[in-house]
Amino acid sequence: MVVLMAYVDALFDTADWFRQLWAESLGKEKSTDGRVVETGPTPIAARGATDQHSQLQLYVEGPRDKVVLMLTARQRETEVVIPDGELTRSRDEYRYLGDRGMGVLLDAELRGTIGSLTNRRRPVGTIELARVDAPSLGALLVLLECATAYAGPLYGVDPFDQPGVEEAKRLAYAALGRAGFEAKDLPPIVGEGRYVL
């Protein structure tokens, strides 16, 4: 499994796009020489720090079958500052937050997550953009596309076809009655011999 965890909200769509790219390019039944291999790492798009709190336990102590890649940017568009007010001054457990930007808080969360994975000897890496802008995003997309293209031969599959997706399209065309597509391989729809809950 490959987890791409975006620590900048503007980069989450890129993590989501990577999930689609990696899944359709590397999830294959057959190798390039025709052998049945049923291979491909499961891609997971995650949003740090939200998914850090919902998924990190699994990544730190669960099966050792994941590589976690952090996606962040050195320069953020806007910085929301936590005011140094009554709450941060009146309670010791909040005092350290006063006058700190949310970027500082997210960076600390990122460092903590990387540290917890590293301390448990879990594979983790970081991709840091200078900023979230067109040149940086373009470079990131090319990097992820190249990584996918190079991973195909490592798994012994062609990363440039998607026969599983094509089959689903053909079956959908058949279900819609499109000329030239037969419905003989269609499964029954819900209610036709299947349990409905």
Residue ranges and their predicted role:
Residues 1-197:
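A SIS-like phosphosugar-recognition module
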